[in-house]
Amino acid sequence: LLTMYSNNPSEQDKPTIQNRHAMSLDNSQTIRSAFFISDGTAITAETLGRSILSQFASVPFETRVLPYVDTLERAEDAVAQINMAYQRDGLLPLVFDTIVNPEIREKVNSAKGCNLDMYEGLIGRIAEETGVEPDGHSGHAHDNVDSETYKERIDAVHFALDNDDGARTRHYSMADIILIGVSRSGKTPTSLYLALQFGIRAANYPLTEDDLYDNQLPKSLREHKDKLFGLLINTDRLVKIRQERRAGSRYSSYQQVQQEQRAIQGIYISQGIPSLDVSEMSVEEIATRILQMTGLKRRIG
């Protein structure tokens, strides 16, 4: 979430897998390549692109982010990567781009890919409707961000980091929300996303084995019960996540995870704590649902 976008494209093109669970359902499933390309940070192309790909959950995608493709030389490098993916996969890569410069966009579109231009169609339609031609420059989305919005965002991120994983509890009175759940249930990334995207001051606290089997909240949480929000995650999924961190341990065993899951659901019910099953949700979906369920108002955005 806090990745800084370098203006060197080679530092941003390491692939990641989206819809990874589709591979566990079908080992013979072909992994499809997808590229998010922009002459700016590529945040918009990546955010919209990943949202669209999430609608095809049965297809695993190997994704690459190529920001700052703002010269013909960099466009040619992007074309080479797309063509290489096509030769390797035998399938046209999906190419999501938000390139404003028509010459650079045309070069990228010359690659052997399924081009999904996110700007051209929209900009043309808006120009037709308003009678005003676009200025053709990238990056204006951030021109009018005022200093107060920036400060709110940074303050919220600092709060999330300072109050991560139950490290500090004395500032919980300043929190907008306190996420709770078992270890590795998605509390930290959700807290950071709430801070970064909405300016929400989110703390998070892991309920330990002792907390769970006492069937009561720790004292530091009882005092702020009205701010608590619980995360739940499917037992099978949580076992896989914990195995990646500590394979073969009691911590990652099915029996241990199942016991923790039952115990924490009991606490949520007995204490009247609102909760959400996040097993098949992206962090964006989790954060949005939390705002919807709690009525929290975003400070920015």
Explain the meaning of each model-derived region:
Residues 160-167, 244, 251-286:
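Small-molecule kinase domains that catalyze NTP-dependent phosphoryl transfer to phosphate-bearing small molecules
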Residues 5-6, 17-52:
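N-terminal accessory targeting/assembly segments
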Residues 202-213:
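Short beta-strand-centered segment that lines the nucleotide-binding/catalytic pocket of NTP-utilizing
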Residues 38-40, 68-69, 97-101, 280:
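Structural motif
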Residues 115-165:
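Hydrophobic alpha-helical segments and helix pairs
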Residues 141, 224-260:
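A glycine- and Lys/Arg-enriched "phosphate-lid" helix/loop adjacent to the NTP-binding pocket
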Residues 152-201:
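Internal active-site segments that recognize and position negatively charged phosphoryl groups
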Residues 65-82, 95-98:
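Metallocofactor- and cofactor-centric catalytic cores in central/energy metabolism, strongly enriched
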